[in-house]
Structures are given as structure tokens and as C-alpha cells.
Amino acid sequence: CSSDLWRTQKNKKALCIIGARQIGKTTIIREFAKQEYENFIEINFILDKGAEKIFEDKLDADTIIENLTAFKMQKMEPGKTLVFLDEIQECPNARCAIKFLVEDGRFDYIESGSLLGVRYKEVPSYAVGFEEIVSMYPMNFREFLRANGVQDTTFTTLQFCYENHNEVPTVMHETLLKLFATYIVVGGMPDVVQTYVDTHDI
């Protein structure tokens, strides 16, 4: 997958994941860190009061890493540590610092946030070329179907019918229409979808 490719890149950029709130950005980043790294440092610029002070001094890598280590009091091993800067739109200096942290190369960095575009103008020297920006969206209808237990065989049948201009079997057609109507109401936010899957209550 693309995250595996990013993990193994030489001279990798910071990964910047942007998207609406509550679509699962933080959850998927934590899971990725658990699988791929020995050490994981997470900073949330909304929840971690005072975190912005990490980036108030000089923006050179050594100073920032010293501040980060003092703030989190966690082990940071070069090549084995992922630093996750969540809600980074709240700390423009952190976005500026990414250039120097990426050039330093000791650790990997993932940024995540909402409304990043709104705050671009607040960044004094946005480091173009040091971020790989990925947009994340709510679940689409196919993902919603999978979450509700629709099997691969159903997708295969649908594709066959589409490619060969055949009618979709009646039971399958009616089931999918009901699920589509439900999707219109429930939407694609992962927590809401999971609640529906667990309770079937709208």
C-alpha cells in the first residue's frame, strides 16, 4: 500500500494528511505507527496545552528535537521513531519547521489536520517540497457496503452484470438499493457508520 511505500522511501518527505474532522485520520495514523515503528511520538496542538512552545525558539532541527524530547519525555531513536503532529493547522511554526526536520533525516514525520488550506497564509515560509500531501475523505458507498458485510462475490457479480449489460439479480438489487438509501442518511463518517453497523438504528 502507499503507506508502506512511504515508509521505505529514502529521503522521504513528511506525510501531510488533510481532511474533515472525524473521518479517522488520527486512528489510521496510530495504527500505522503501531505496525511500523518501535517509537511513536504524538503531539496534538489542540489537546496538548503548551505544545506550540516546542516551536517558539529557533527552528533548527536540534533545538526542536530537544524541545520535543523534553515536552513528551519519550524515547526517540533515529530510524525507528515516527513523530505525529496532529491538528497542525493550530501551529503555523510547526509547518515551517518541517523543512528543517525533514532535512535532518533522523526521524519520520506525519502531519494531520483540518482546514489546513485556510491557514496557509499564516505560515511565514511554507516549505514547498518537504511535504507529501494526501487528502482523506469519508467512506464512499463501496466502503460503506463492505462495512455492512457485503461480500466480494457480490461486487464480482455486479461488475459482471455491468460489463455484460445483464440485469442484476432481484434480491441483490433490492438489498443494495436499501443500503444506498441508508448510506444517504447515515453518511460516511467512520464512527457513525460503526454505530449503525452495531445497532442498525438510524
What residue spans do the PLM features occupy?
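Phosphate-binding site recognition
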Residues: 1-202
